[in-house]
Amino acid sequence: MTRDEKIYFSLLRIGLGTESPREILPELAKLQWGEIYRLAVRQGTGALIWDALRQLHAMEYLPLSLRVQWAYNVEQIEDRYRKQEKVLAGLSKFYASHSISLMLLKGYGLSFCYPCPEHRECGDIDIWLFGRQREADELLCRE
């Protein structure tokens, strides 16, 4: 594992709240920030690493253009999360009005275990309808 990858994982643990910020600031000045950013985006952890950098007051280590790009990316993650919240609330209300129970699975539900739920990137919304999927699909098609 490279030095940058080790620091990435340390930043991830800080962002998740499982590691207290330690004296890694001297190491941060030496990082290849473009590579850290690409790794974070590829792994879906860009907002979590951003949280760690904010906790460490380490933004000055990032080139300005990367800082702006990263901040914009975090805003996009938060916007998608809010949209998913609205969709999930609508689905939940719709199914409840038809007496169909819904269980939220994986991604979005797990976000509540994170220090900042809207910084947990989620793909789609996975739900279980307790064997009533076909009926639920038909109801949605009629709406």
Language-model features and meaning:
Residues 94, 102, 115, 140-143:
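Catalytic domains that recognize anionic headgroups
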